Amino acid sequence: MKKGIFLYLSLLALSLSAQDNIQWRGTDRTGIYHETGLLKSWPENGPVLLWHYDGLGEGHSSVAIDSEKIYITGLTEGQGYIYVFDMNGKLLKKKEYGPDWNTNYIGPRGTVTVNEGKIYLISGLGDIYCFDQDNLNAVWKKSLLQEYNASNTEWGICEAPLIIDEKIIATPGGKEHNMVALNKNTGELIWSSPGEGDLSAYCSPLYISDQQVPIIVTMTADHIIGVNASTGEKLWSHENKNRYSVHANTPVYSNRMILCTSGYGRGSTMLRLTNGGKSIEQVWFSAELDNRIGSMVKVGDYAYGSGDSKRYWFCVDWNTGEIKFKEQGLAMGNIISDDAMLYCYTDRGDMALAKATPEKFDVVSKFPVTMGTEQHWAHPVIYKGVLYVRHGNTLMAYKVK
């Protein structure tokens, strides 16, 4: 009996682990990964490079991992491709899906989402795709901008599809059809929300399921909005403007509190859900905490990230907004966390490992990412003791356990 229980728990743990990275920034889009026994420091030249692949084409999307396969996108000569690798870096499949963003900072932006045998993708041109996971054949495709009378953004749509039960959520940014829920199997419209009628703002939405109503939270050009995930009803909004209408960071949620952060002259806003999620109140605001595109992570009672205007790395008390430290030394960048450590990938190409402590920005190791092309913007991913880093044309896998 004990052996049976142990086997069941072991299989369950493996199953949960295999599902950890099927979408943008992990299981629940928090950037928090759930492994143990990871290295607390790295050799001077960085952790062991297990493998790398140099033929992705351009792009800024991260990997998604499901059933021991790695999925990522890239752009070559104006055409977008999905790549599938095994865990040893062997290319299993490569399939063209159509044109993608080729105007500025070219290449796919949004990370794919894997769900129940399908792969979902929103291109920089605003096309939403559903592919069969096994053969990568297209199941359906919709043009979000054409079908919902929306305009593209200056730097291309950047959104990772959000799956909720039978629905796939996207933010075309139209006046009438600001956010939509489509049937994930057919692409047909389930509901449409006018939101505040803003343009889309490069934000991948967050799903909150522990309130009286299920809520989708995202940032559009001038607002933070909360939408009823079942009906599309706009529950609330909060004005949130910055210089270029860029709000690229997925909100962070914990215990009724939502942290939304943006650069370009904005900062961080902490909202609290009230009335079972049907309304909000502002808890605190800080103009100093102005993360541009690197996201933030919550570890314990503190949030960590980097700033835009002054290039600080900072720690803030989640509940009060008190800044615990703001330190320079690394260029600004993106951040994930695992096993009480912070993984900071800067836009100058340094990968740093720091302790998640409010006392100081304690960087214990770092190394330069020398392979790859163009901007260092793709967010890293951790899966089964391996750190996956994408730099333009190159995908790298480092052993961190």
State each model region's role:
Residues 266-267, 288-356:
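Loop/turn-rich, solvent-exposed surfaces of beta-rich toroidal or solenoidal domains
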Residues 67-68, 116-117, 165-166, 212-214, ...:
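Short coil/turn segments that connect the beta-strands within blades of beta-propeller domains
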Residues 19-48, 269:
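Blade/loop signatures of beta-propeller domains
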Residues 373-401:
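Blade-level signature of beta-propeller repeat domains, shared across WD40, Kelch, NHL, RCC1
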Residues 26-29, 75-77, 124, 173-174, ...:
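Short loop/turn segments immediately following the C-termini of beta-strands
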Residues 1-20:
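Bacterial Sec-dependent N-terminal signal peptides
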Residues 50-64, 94-113, 141-163, 176, ...:
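Extracytoplasmic beta-rich repeat domains
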